[in-house]
């Protein structure tokens, strides 16, 4: 009998996973996606719908009767995957774990229950509640939707006068109209990526983040391995495995963000039961850790399938986000260098002649990225490559 494999969320970020699925024999590949903007693959059938519309998702699954379901790098797709896995008794994350992963308020409550170190927080839905929180806690504070994606709606509040603007800016990105306000923890931001193996969660890659500035909660680069000493690195990796266990995740990839303060205390920002975006799980972590997460996820998700895991040489990797000045693009040069360099694992610059570039305000509207690998000095290699990029603007 043929496998009926359903993959949910099939944009450019999922291409490495989709490529491997289409190599499988005796398998039909089905998909659900937001729209028809990504037409690279010939699926057996595909449903276009809002992934928050669970009625459409379940109806399509009922129609095809999948024997496997997968997703990666997308919170809403993760939620759909968990529901379909539960309904059809398939391998996958549980509905409980998916909800803890995508709902910041539920995750914060789980942290309290399990004694996971986290910032003091409160659930809010009004401006007055922010003022009340600020009376008990010193500025700066952070406000964020409980159900956003990336850094959309995450706003740092430095003074009493900034509260009203911050509230509405955050509310724009809240699906439920609910947000959390929390203490701002000053320190080094890091990410830890891992996988839930049969014996338990394992940390595979630690990276340090650089920010555009202190108030805008947007990263400009993420470096693997992180710029930390070996003792602290080992402490963080062990802590992450403990956090993932306490949150209850037991299937698939994990992607967690932490802040390390000046006392080397480790505060959880959030931990997702999925891979990190911008090819973090499918390109970056394998090339840094040597572990083929894509093949591992396929083998764990599809019964009676055991494909050979690919071999990767462990290297330094830099995910460099691009931040161009605003203006109308007349011409862009230097892409030929990115296309031919063996040090470039992947890149995405969705800018063409005539486009108007706006200022970066969140993870979602950054101007592109380049993923660079090197045995040593990956930042130097990255800078040399990116220096070839040049945008000429209309006057």
Language-model-derived ranges and their functions:
Residues 1-96, 305-307, 324, 351-356, ...:
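ATP-binding N-terminal substructure of ATP-dependent carboxylate-amine bond-forming enzymes
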Residues 46-52, 122-126, 155-157:
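Short acidic-hydrophobic, aromatic-tinged amphipathic segments that line or gate anion-handling sites
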Residues 86-153:
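A conserved helix-loop-beta module that forms one wall/lid of the active-site cleft
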Residues 117-119, 136, 140-143, 155-191, ...:
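Conserved ATP-binding module of the ATP-grasp superfamily
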Residues 180, 251-256, 307-313, 394-395:
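Flexible, glycine/charged-enriched surface loops at secondary-structure junctions
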Residues 183-249, 253, 260, 272-296, ...:
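ATP-dependent carboxylate/phosphate-activation module, predominantly the ATP-grasp catalytic core
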Residues 254, 267, 340-355:
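A structural supersecondary motif
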Residues 305-342:
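A glycine-rich beta-turn/hairpin centered on an aromatic-Pro dipeptide
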């Amino acid at each position: 009998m043929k496998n009926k494999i359903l993959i949910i969320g099939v944009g450019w970020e999922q291409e490495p996973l989709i490529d491997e699925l289409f190599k499988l024999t005796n398998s039909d590949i089905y998909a659900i996606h937001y729209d028809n903007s990504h037409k690279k693959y010939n699926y057996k059938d595909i449903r276009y719908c809002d992934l928050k519309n669970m009625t459409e998702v379940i109806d399509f699954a009922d129609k095809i009767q999948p024997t496997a379901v997968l997703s990666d790098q997308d919170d809403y797709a993760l939620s759909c995957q968990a529901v379909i896995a539960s309904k059809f008794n398939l391998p996958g994350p549980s509905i409980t774990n998916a909800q803890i992963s995508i709902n910041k308020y539920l995750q914060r409550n789980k942290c309290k229950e399990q004694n996971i170190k986290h910032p003091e927080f409160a659930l809010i839905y009004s401006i007055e509640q922010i003022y009340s929180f600020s009376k008990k806690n010193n500025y700066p504070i952070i406000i964020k939707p409980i159900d956003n994606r990336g850094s959309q709606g995450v706003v740092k509040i430095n003074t009493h006068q900034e509260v009203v603007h911050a509230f509405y800016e955050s509310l724009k990105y809240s699906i439920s109209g609910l947000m959390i306000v929390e203490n701002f923890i000053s320190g080094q931001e890091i990410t830890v990526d891992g996988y839930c193996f049969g014996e338990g969660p394992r940390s595979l890659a630690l990276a340090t983040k650089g920010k555009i500035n202190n108030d805008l909660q947007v990263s400009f680069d993420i470096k693997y391995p992180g710029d930390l000493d070996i003792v602290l690195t080992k402490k963080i990796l062990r802590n992450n495995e403990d956090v993932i266990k306490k949150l209850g995740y037991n299937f698939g990839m994990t992607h967690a963000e932490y802040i390390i303060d000046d006392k080397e205390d480790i505060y959880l920002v959030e931990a997702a039961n999925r891979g990190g975006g911008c090819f973090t799980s499918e390109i970056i972590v394998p090339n840094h850790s040597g572990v083929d997460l894509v093949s591992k996820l396929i083998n764990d998700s599809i019964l009676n399938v055991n494909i050979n895991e690919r071999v990767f040489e462990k290297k330094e990797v830099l995910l460099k986000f691009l931040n161009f000045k605003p203006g109308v693009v007349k011409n862009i040069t230097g892409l030929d260098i990115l296309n031919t360099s063996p040090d470039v694992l992947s890149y995405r610059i969705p800018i063409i002649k005539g486009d108007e570039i706006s200022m970066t305000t969140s993870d979602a509207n950054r101007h592109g990225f380049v993923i660079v690998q090197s045995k040593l000095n990956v930042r130097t290699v990255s800078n040399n490559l990116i220096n070839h990029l040049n945008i000429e603007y209309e006057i």
